[in-house]
Amino acid sequence: AVQLVFTDAEKAEFKFGFKSKDGDNSITAKELGEFLESAGKSFSEEQLAQMISDVDTDKSGTIEFSEMLMGIAEKMMKWTWKKSHFQKAFDDMDKDGNGVLSPEELHLAMSTRIEPPMSKEAIDAIIAKADCDGDGKINRKEFVKLIKSS
C-alpha cells in the first residue's frame, strides 16, 4: 500500500524548500519559475502556468503548501503504480523465480506474448543492450531500465 501521509520530518523538509518570496505561504508561477531557474531549469510562462494548474486544487492561481504535498503524493502514487506493474511483468516472465530473466525466459515471453513474435536475434540484441553486468541475463533493475528507455 502507498503511504499518503507524510511524517512531520518529511513535511518540515518540504516546507524548507517551499518558500514564497512575499511570505504569503503560496507560490505563484513567477516564483516557481525563479526557483526552477535557480536550479538550472527553464520553462515558458505557459509551462509554469500548467504546472501550477496541475496541483492548484482551489483554483487560486497559486500553489499552497498543502497542494504541493498532495501533488508530491500523487506523483509518488503514479511512480509506485508503474513500478508495481514492471515488477508484475518481470515476475510473469521469471518462470523459475530466481530473480533474473534468462535468454530462454525472455525468448518464451517475447515469442508468445507479442504479435508478431520477436526473432531470437532481436531478443539477443535486447539482452545485449539491457545486460549491464554482463552475466547474460536481465535482473529487475536492468529490466526496469530497459522498459523506461523504450
UniProtKB/Swiss-Prot annotation:
Domain EF-hand: 7-42, 43-78, 81-116, 118-150
Subcellular location: Nucleus; Cytoplasm, Cytoskeleton, Spindle
Binding of Ca(2+) 2, residues: D56, D58, S60, T62, E67
Protein name as it appears in the record: 15 kDa calcium-binding protein
GO cellular component: cytoplasm; nucleus; spindle
Organism: Hemicentrotus pulcherrimus (Sea urchin)
One of the record's GO molecular function terms: calcium ion binding
Pfam families attached to this UniProt entry: EF-hand_7
PANTHER family: CALCIUM BINDING PROTEIN
Function: May play an important role in mitosis of sea urchin egg. May function as a Ca(2+)-dependent intracellular modulator of microtubule assembly.
Binding site for Ca(2+) 1: D22, D24, S26, T28
List of residues that carry N-acetylalanine: A1
